[in-house]
Amino acid sequence: MTKEFHHVTVLLHETIDMLDVKPDGIYVDATLGGAGHSEYLLSKLSEKGHLYAFDQDQNAIDNAQKRLAPYIEKGMVTFIKDNFRHLQARLRETGVQEIDGICYDLGVSSPQLDQRERGFSYKKDAPLDMRMNQDASLTAYEVVNNYDYHDLVRIFFKYGEDKFSKQIARKIEQAREVKPIETTTELAEIIKLVKPAKELKKKGHPAKQIFQAIRIEVNDELGAADESIQQAMDMLALDGRISVITFHSLEDRLTKQLFKEASTVEVPKGLPFIPDDLKPKMELVSRKPILPSAEELEANNRSHSAKLRVVRKIHK
């Protein structure tokens, strides 16, 4: 049975407007989710334009088929159920060699967080899962119960940036010797036991960073984003654009670095001109990230950490 996807789209107009949509163009929504960005983008296309929408969650696609029905009837939408790390291969399978723009809304979607049984949330008791693609084999349960101490410390530091990573990994080791850690609540309670009283008084849930780290590991989120954004830059037509929304420092750092590398070039001093093969491919559309408006922040609590970065293709 398909579950409803209740999702408030973050930075909706900014993300799509910054793509400078060409009515007859070919566009990609790399993270379909609740289909808010897709719907707004489609409203800017003529019937000659086309949108390719990626999501690895069948539930998202099922719901988007209802929301986007008027555009589907006109043959303007193609859904691709896959991880966006396969962007280039899947688009080429359909005959697409170039795209005019693409948007990314990175991280976990609100409906996935809100569906208790998906096991993403530390606020709701559920089996440890955290798979965005429910056909994937690696689950949060596997990570928590089967990764050794050193691997747990590595992902907690790298993806959660939690200063208590070693202590939490040790406590998990001790707990699972007694019995497997099976639920989100069990894991959250173990994390709470490690955190000092002053940490527990701080704003935000004490398990937030560790849950983020496990989720990123289960879905290889940063690896997938890195591969996909690089493929997107290769596939962009001249003057095409990429919009990327991030929600935490790791995603933003990755996006910022990829865009910086593609938009700058180091050449020896004294060269009278820059050879074509050394010219940067991309140009930053905005030097600083675009942030949600005060109105959006008030209306949607989940938009607080959102940042939007945009680049434009200026050279093949």
From Swiss-Prot:
Disulfide bonds: none annotated. One of its GO terms (cellular component) is cytoplasm. It comes from the Bacteria. InterPro entries: RsmH, SAM-dep_MeTrfase_MraW_recog, SAM-dependent_MTases_sf. GO terms for biological process: rRNA base methylation. Its EC number is 2.1.1.199. It catalyses: cytidine(1402) in 16S rRNA + S-adenosyl-L-methionine = N(4)-methylcytidine(1402) in 16S rRNA + S-adenosyl-L-homocysteine + H(+). One of its GO terms (molecular function) is rRNA (cytosine-N4-)-methyltransferase activity. It is found in: Cytoplasm. Signal peptide: none annotated. Keywords: Cytoplasm, Methyltransferase, rRNA processing, S-adenosyl-L-methionine, Transferase. It is an enzyme of class 2 (transferase). Coiled coil: none annotated. S-adenosyl-L-methionine binds at residues 35-37, 55, 84, 105, 112. Its main location: cytoplasm. Pfam families: Methyltransf_5. Specifically methylates the N4 position of cytidine in position 1402 (C1402) of 16S rRNA. Belongs to the methyltransferase superfamily. RsmH family. HAMAP family: 16SrRNA_methyltr_H. This is Ribosomal RNA small subunit methyltransferase H.
